[in-house]
Amino acid sequence: MLLTGLAKKAWGENEDAVIGLGMLPGRKGKKASGFFTRFPTGGTGETPYFYYENVSSHLVEKSKEGKREYKIENLCDMREDTPWVEGVAGWGIGESFVIKTWKSSDDKYILLMNGYISASNPKLYDENGRIKKIMVEGVTSGKKKEFIVKDTPHPQTVDISFLPEQEDVKITILDVYKGTKYEDTAIHFMILWRTEVIPYE
């Protein structure tokens, strides 16, 4: 399972520089290490630089081992097996959340990785639902636009330059790619980002 993408013209670096985002392929019987070759600014689950609010739901799984929650904070955690998963009956159509922004931010894109990503159990990507169409809306301005999201675990971006800068962004699920086993829709990673990502083909 190869996961990669290229971010162009990163802030604070040479304008011609290219940043790589990638997951190393998992070897049989071993978990992939070095999940990302480089972390984009956005933090991890422990020290997030992005915050989320007004999330409509999240999945809580109960088993003999205990309880596991697929919380919205997982969206800024790049480690494998840490998606946000909606928690309502059905495919999560209409579920939503808000990504908070910073007063000094100049983000023009949403950087995301679709689905449930697991190097040790890659079939979870197909078995769970993935977002297909989303509504992106400025919380203050009310400006909104629909986008089709690619059905790929590779990093991709959504251009939100139509929104005023420093505006909180509301995401609503409008349609999904249905999973083959679980009636749950997952997003592995989603933050606001300054640069476009060139998807791996």
What residue ranges belong to the model's regions?
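Residue-level detector of intrinsically disordered/flexible regions characterized by low predicted structural confidence
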Residues: 10, 30-33, 76, 134-137, ...
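Extracellular carbohydrate recognition and processing domains
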Residues: 141-162
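Short, surface-exposed beta-strand/loop "edge" segments at domain boundaries and coil↔beta transitions
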Residues: 25-34, 107, 143, 179-180
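Aromatic, loop-rich ligand-recognition surfaces of beta-strand-rich domains
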Residues: 69-140, 157, 164-201
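Compositionally biased, intrinsically disordered low-complexity segments
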Residues: 21-22, 58, 134, 139-142
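Disordered, acidic Ser/Thr/Pro-rich linker "stalks" and the adjacent N-terminal cap
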Residues: 3-100, 196-201
